[in-house]
């Protein structure tokens, strides 16, 4: 009981596409099913904790390498399936797929309910165009969303280039 046995998952978005034809970022029925799936996982780990007297938890896995490996294997075994194996990787955990265009607010609203179900670990990522170091309001907006939606952990990714030799900075790619 000195540690935690974590049960993680990747590819919820692709699983939902397979089951209902859309992922949770684009469809309320898919969101409802996604929450049911992860709630089931949480309930099971709670049962395991009680039964085996060990600490179990569900974690929203950030597994870029594994997500690619699973997709390659599934593509080999099942072929090219639109919306599922037609990309190079599965989406991390309960994230809205990066290719799906939606606002940061919509992404937060969709992903936030999973944070309470994945107490073993989770993260909310926001991609911001350009250099956010000169736009602190963009960062504060993300912090406000975390508070509003009761998110446990978040990160803001933004484009910033800096030469370590001369110190030149820009936000061009």
Predicted regions and their residues:
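Long, C-terminal-biased catalytic regions of enzyme "large/alpha" subunits
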Residues: 1-173
């Amino acid at each position: 009981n000195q540690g935690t046995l974590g049960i993680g998952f990747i590819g919820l978005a692709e699983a939902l596409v397979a089951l209902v034809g859309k992922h949770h970022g684009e469809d309320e029925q898919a969101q409802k099913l996604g929450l049911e799936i992860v709630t089931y996982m949480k309930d099971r780990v709670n049962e395991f904790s009680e039964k085996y007297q060990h600490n179990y938890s569900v974690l929203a896995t950030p597994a870029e390498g594994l997500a690619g490996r699973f997709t390659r294997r599934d593509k080999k075994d099942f072929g090219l399936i639109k919306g599922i194996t037609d990309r190079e990787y599965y989406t991390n955990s309960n994230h809205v797929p990066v290719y799906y265009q939606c606002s940061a607010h919509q992404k937060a609203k969709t992903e936030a309910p999973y944070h309470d179900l994945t107490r073993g670990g989770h993260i909310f990522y926001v991609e911001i165009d350009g250099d956010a170091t000169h736009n602190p309001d963009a960062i504060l907006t993300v912090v406000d969303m975390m508070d509003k939606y009761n998110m446990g952990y978040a990160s803001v990714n933004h484009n910033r280039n800096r030469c370590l030799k001369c110190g030149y900075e820009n936000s061009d790619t």
